[in-house]
Structure formats: structure tokens, C-alpha cells
Amino acid sequence: MTSTASDILSVYFLQMQAQNKNLLRVVPLFETLDDLKNANGVMTNLFKLSWYRKMINSKQEVMIGYSDSSKDAGKLSASWHQYKLQEELRSLAKKYKIDLIFFHGRGGSPGRGGGPIQATLKSQPSGTVNGKIRITDQGEVIQQKYGYKPLAEYNLCSYIGSVTVSYTHLTLPTMYTV
């Protein structure tokens, strides 16, 4: 989890010390309620650094965790802070001309970010999907969603369709909604 800018910078520093010529991207994870509240400040401290923006090629992925914040604050409060953070980071990225992609660490239950992908993406703040999103499905739901080929195809189509609808702001006829 990420609490300070140094949590991110130290990983890059270790890669440089190891003389890794192709730096692996480092994705900050904001999951606890305190981390969600402090994330805008953390990312501001990083984005203010011109060499950091250059190092990441003006592309930043940020992971939003669901489980710990729901445990800390309850589902409603956690959801509000996750929503608010995405709005703040969208504005911050725009200010610094950073291409921002949100990475959602979803569990199976609604308290862990689970639920229908269509509803999840419709509920994201405007301008935070932009045709790009990363989502993990936790171990307990992988078999349920992808263990049988027709289900895997259905779920993949649901993800692709939901991102497309969210990005283009299209409204699908009811017969096509899942």
C-alpha cells in the first residue's frame, strides 16, 4: 500500500540501483481509508517532480483497493472516498498532462468492490474510464467467472461492452443490458 511519495520513489530507486535499464512501472495502491484521504497529496508530490513525469513518460496507473477501506470505514464511506479520490486524481492528472489509468482491485462481494461490471463502470466519476481501465478479479471469483468457456466469453464481452458504453456515453437498449 502507498502512504507517501517515498513508497513509490524507493521502488524506482531500487530498480536504478540494480541497474535495471527497463524500469518496471510502479503502481501506487490506495486502499485504507487514510491512504484514500492522503492519495491526492501523495500523487501531487510525485507529479510536481518534472523528472518523475519524464520517467513515467507522463503515464500513471493508480490502483484503488476496496477491501481495507470498507473494513475501516464501512461500505458507504469507503465508496464515497474512492469516488472522490478518482475525481481529484483525474483533475490532478489533467493539470500535469498525465495519462491516468485507474486499476480497480475488486473482490467477489460488493464490500470488496464486486458486483456487476456494468453497474460498477456506470458509477465511476465522469472522465475516469476514458476507454481504459484495469480490473483484477480476486481468486474466489476467477473460477466462477472464467472457469467455463461460455461464462468467460460472456464476462469478457461484459467488460468490453461496459468500458465502451462508459467511454462513449452510449445508452444501450434494455434488451442488450446485462
Q: Each predicted region: which residue ranges?
A:
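Catalytic or ion-translocation cores adjacent to nucleophile or general acid/base/metal-coordination motifs
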Residues: 18-167
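Conserved small/polar residues in nucleotide/adenosyl-binding loops
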Residues: 168-174
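Structured, charged N-terminal subsegments at the starts of enzyme catalytic cores
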Residues: 1-27
